């Protein structure tokens, strides 16, 4: 049973990190194009 709880909390953390990395990559690309 403890394995099921760990698996549910792992995907949630990966989704939050993926959203932050996409926002940072889009902002860096915009700064390079403007310069």
Curated annotation (Swiss-Prot):
The keyword Nucleus applies. Keywords: Chromosome, Developmental protein, Differentiation, DNA condensation, DNA-binding, Nucleosome core, Nucleus, Phosphoprotein, Spermatogenesis. Gonads. The keyword Acetylation does not apply. It comes from the Eukaryota. It is found in: Nucleus; Chromosome. Transmembrane segments: none annotated. GO terms for biological process: cell differentiation; mitotic chromosome condensation; nucleosome assembly; spermatogenesis. GO terms for molecular function: DNA binding. Its main location: nucleus. The modification Phosphoserine is found at residues 9, 21. Residues 1-35 are annotated as: Disordered. Protamines substitute for histones in the chromatin of sperm during the haploid phase of spermatogenesis. They compact sperm DNA into a highly condensed, stable and inactive complex. This is Sperm protamine alpha isoform 2. It comes from Scomber scombrus (Atlantic mackerel).
């Amino acid at each position: 049973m403890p394995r099921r709880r760990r698996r549910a909390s792992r995907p949630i953390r990966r989704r939050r990190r993926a959203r932050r990395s996409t926002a940072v990559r889009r902002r860096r690309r915009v700064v390079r194009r403007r310069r």
